[in-house]
Structure formats: structure tokens, C-alpha cells
Amino acid sequence: MAGHSKFKNIQHRKGAQDKKKSKVFTKLIREIVTAVKTGASNVPENNPRLRKALNAARSQNLPKERIDKAINSANDASNNESYMEIRYEGYAPNGIAIIVEALTDNKNRTASEVRSSFTKYGGILGETGSVNYLFNHCGVIQYPINIASNEDIFEAAIQAGGNDIISDYITHTIYTDIENFYKALGFLTDKYGIPEDSYIGWIPVNTIIIDDKEKAKKLLKLIAVLEENDDVQRVFGNYMLSEDVYEIIQEE
């Protein structure tokens, strides 16, 4: 009986992992299609957004045939598939500002689903521009801490045109102006390889510390539900979990 239960748990975890991977692949494919359709070239070297999208896809092990299919689909003049880039803004419980970036082929559907998620978990969806003043809009490039020393990565970031770099015990994070993002990303990719993550995003000017476990779980549930939406590419918030709350949640 115990063996059967363990098997079921393994199957459940595998199913959840497969579902999560499928959603990641869907988001990657949408970004590839959008990069091709909005770029001036199908050649990654001449289309920085496409180069970034392809690097991200390969780092997530998106099969080559699916990458090629996405590019061919985007190049097909008879294919009307296209995605709109839309930003949603609102508040989670306890005054946490949330920005949601989406790529969608149906903005009414996405708006309804995002609004429903906010409402279900105690938040409120506002108008575009209602919270973005609480964030800096900039480029972010992240490498594992062991890729280079703090001094070397700092020097490389300056050469790449970065504005700031923060190194903790896990990650080097380089910040850039939006207009310099792809140039900096190309420079650092040539020097250190594909980064762990890179994006143009929203970094909070100030953060609200969440030091209550139940409040943290409710907030993280809202963010998880938003991120599970196929149309949602990224979710940003101006919060940070306290060390104690983070450790408690990690253990559960």
C-alpha cells in the first residue's frame, strides 16, 4: 500500500512538472514568434530580441523542431497568428504593487482571467499606469555567482554599458538602461555564455517586507496563479519575504 502511495506521489509530481514545462514552452514559443514578427530580420545576429528568445529556449531545452516550427510559422505570410504585448497593473493584499506582462492573441480573455485572479486572492486590478511609478523600468541580466569574481563581473558590466551590478551569494545581477539592454546582453553572452535569466522588467524602487506567513502564502498563491496563465510572461511585485518567513515556506 505504501509503495502504491509513493508511486502515485511520483506520478503526480511528474505530471505537475510536465505541465509546468509545457507552460514554459508555450511562453517561449510566443516570444520567438513575436520576436520574428516585430524584428527587422530573421537572423538572430541582426535581431537581438530573437537571439535572446532562442537562447532562452535552448537553455530550457525547447526541442529544435519546435523552435524551427515557431520561426517558420512567424515567417508564413498566410499565418495571421500574432500576439499583443499588454501590461496589467494592480494591488495584491496588504498594498503590494503588482505588474503583469502578457503576450496574448485575445486581450479580452486575458484581461478577464487576470482580473479574476486578482479578485479571487484579495487583490484589485487597476488601470495601466496605476502602480508603475513604484518601479524602475530597466534591463536585467543574471549570472550564477561562480561565473566570475565580483571584480571581473563588475568590470565586464561597465564595459557592457551596465548601470549597476549587485552580487549576493547566489547571483550576479546587472542592470541596464532599456536602450542598452540588448547591446549589454550580447556583450556579456559573448564573454560568459547564456545568462541564467535576462529580461526588460520592472524593479521596485522600494520593497515591502512580508513577515507574516499567511500573508506571504496568499501573495505567493496570487503570483503563482498569474504565472500559470499561458498569456502571462512575467509578474513583478514590490515585496520581499523576511528571512524567517522565507525559511518557513521553503520547509512546507
Swiss-Prot record:
Q: Record's InterPro entries?
A: Integrase-like_N, TACO1_YebC-like_2nd/3rd_dom, TACO1_YebC_N, Transcrip_reg_TACO1-like, Transcrip_reg_TACO1-like_dom3, YebC-like
Q: Which Gene3D superfamilies match?
A: 1.10.10.200, 3.30.70.980
Keyword Ribonucleoprotein set for record: no
Please give the family membership noted in the entry.
Belongs to the TACO1 family.
State a single Gene Ontology molecular function: DNA binding
Segments of this protein annotated with the region Disordered: 1-22
Q: What is this protein called?
A: Probable transcriptional regulatory protein RP455
Which key words tag this protein in UniProt? Answer: Cytoplasm, DNA-binding, Transcription, Transcription regulation
Give the record's GO biological process terms: regulation of DNA-templated transcription
Sorted alphabetically, the Gene Ontology cellular component annotations on this record are: cytoplasm
What NCBIfam families does this protein's entry cite? Answer: PRK00110.1, PRK12378.1, YebC/PmpR family DNA-binding transcriptional regulator
